[in-house]
């Protein structure tokens, strides 16, 4: 069985001192590039999708594609619900075979966040599904959810321990200065806060908003306990820019099988770099 939970992936990463990249996919070509590149580098990867992606492609279609590609390449893959907020939506997708969930209730007050997350954990663990949750809020936009930078909150290390123990989550997404989207200038990550969180919480930690971070910053977060690195915008930008360039240079192009190749090549460069930055090549 090549479609797996993220729990063992992330526990292995925690023990091995590397991170597993989670790539948000948006179409068939994105998935092909992620899986083909990961298989060629023998690297564990997570196929992530926001609610918008699952609505666009269809849950059953995505599950079938991931399963087929995992078998084709004899490569373990996890399909992960990224930034899902509704219990009924999560439950339906779990019953369809999804084995990794992020319940995002980080916009709620602390006690309500715990209550919402624990409800999802109690349900998901009955199906051997791993659960990630977020404490603190990232700025930027994910799907149609916009968080102003002024409203973004960093993760409190002491609260993080209480949150982890009260909910029973399998991994914790932390807010240390990253944001969804690309950065106009290099962000100032709070490494001391991350180190403090690591001292209080013995779970695999997750970094959202990693698109555009430097190799140095990514590798420093891994040293301080990050076991999962989320990348979305960087893939979308590479795809769209390469496609625009190709169609500008070849205005006569009409066959998607031709003009999408340039976009796939551009995404392949992103995926291989992220895998290298995470230190997970050869770990699958």
Swiss-Prot record:
- Return the GO cellular component terms, semicolon-separated: cytosol
Q: Please tell me where dihydroxyacetone phosphate binds in this chain.
A: 181, 209-211, 230-233
Q: Which GO terms describe its molecular function?
A: tagatose-bisphosphate aldolase activity; zinc ion binding
Subunit annotation? Forms a complex with GatZ.
Q: Which reaction does it catalyse?
A: D-tagatofuranose 1,6-bisphosphate = D-glyceraldehyde 3-phosphate + dihydroxyacetone phosphate
Q: In which pathway does it act?
A: Carbohydrate metabolism; D-tagatose 6-phosphate degradation; D-glyceraldehyde 3-phosphate and glycerone phosphate from D-tagatose 6-phosphate: step 2/2
What family name appears in the similarity comment? Belongs to the class II fructose-bisphosphate aldolase family. TagBP aldolase GatY subfamily.
Q: What CDD domains does this protein map onto?
A: TBP_aldolase_IIB
Work out whether the entry's keyword set contains Zinc. yes
Tell me which cofactor or cofactors this protein depends on.
Answer: Zn(2+)
Name the top EC class: lyase
Q: What does this protein do?
A: Catalytic subunit of the tagatose-1,6-bisphosphate aldolase GatYZ, which catalyzes the reversible aldol condensation of dihydroxyacetone phosphate (DHAP or glycerone-phosphate) with glyceraldehyde 3-phosphate (G3P) to produce tagatose 1,6-bisphosphate (TBP). Requires GatZ subunit for full activity and stability. Is involved in the catabolism of galactitol.
Q: What is its EC number?
A: 4.1.2.40
Q: Which residues form the active site?
A: 82 (proton donor)
Q: What PANTHER family does UniProt report for this protein, alphabetically?
A: D-TAGATOSE-1,6-BISPHOSPHATE ALDOLASE, D-TAGATOSE-1,6-BISPHOSPHATE ALDOLASE SUBUNIT GATY-RELATED
What are the top taxonomic ranks of the organism? Bacteria, Pseudomonadati, Pseudomonadota, Gammaproteobacteria, Enterobacterales
This protein is called: D-tagatose-1,6-bisphosphate aldolase subunit GatY
**Which positions are annotated as binding Zn(2+)?**
83, 180, 208
> Origin, by domain of life?
Bacteria
What does the record's cofactor remark say about binding?
Answer: Binds 1 zinc ion per subunit.
Q: Tell whether Zinc is among the UniProt keywords.
A: yes
Alphabetized UniProt keyword annotations = Galactitol metabolism, Lyase, Metal-binding, Zinc
Tell me any Pfam family this protein matches.
F_bP_aldolase
Per the record, the GO terms for biological process are: D-tagatose 6-phosphate catabolic process; galactitol catabolic process
Species of origin: Escherichia coli (strain SMS-3-5 / SECEC)
């Amino acid at each position: 069985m090549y479609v797996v939970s993220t729990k063992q992936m992330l526990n292995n990463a925690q023990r091995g001192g590397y991170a597993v990249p989670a790539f948000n996919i948006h179409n068939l070509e994105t998935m092909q590039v992620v899986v083909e590149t990961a298989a060629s580098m023998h690297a564990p990867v997570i196929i992530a999708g926001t609610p918008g992606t699952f609505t666009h492609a269809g849950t059953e279609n995505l599950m079938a594609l991931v399963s087929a590609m995992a078998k084709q390449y004899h490569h373990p893959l996890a399909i992960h619900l990224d930034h899902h907020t509704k219990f009924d939506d999560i439950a339906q997708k779990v019953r369809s075979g999804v084995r990794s969930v992020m319940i995002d209730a980080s916009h709620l007050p602390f006690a309500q966040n715990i209550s919402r997350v624990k409800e999802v954990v109690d349900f998901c663990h009955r199906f051997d599904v791993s659960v990630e949750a977020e404490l603190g809020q990232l700025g930027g936009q994910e799907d149609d959810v916009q968080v102003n930078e002024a409203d973004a909150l960093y993760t409190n290390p002491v609260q993080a321990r209480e949150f982890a123990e009260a909910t029973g989550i399998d991994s914790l997404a932390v807010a240390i200065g990253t944001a969804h989207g690309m950065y106009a200038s290099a962000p100032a990550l709070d490494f001391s806060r991350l180190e403090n969180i690591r001292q209080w919480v013995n779970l695999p930690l997750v970094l959202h908003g990693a698109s555009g971070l430097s190799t140095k910053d990514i590798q420093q977060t891994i040293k301080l306990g990050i076991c999962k690195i989320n990348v979305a915008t960087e893939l979308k930008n590479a795809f769209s820019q390469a496609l625009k360039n190709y169609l500008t240079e070849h205005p006569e192009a009409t066959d998607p099988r031709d003009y999408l190749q340039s976009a796939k090549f551009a995404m392949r460069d992103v995926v291989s770099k992220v895998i290298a930055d995470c230190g997970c090549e050869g770990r699958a």
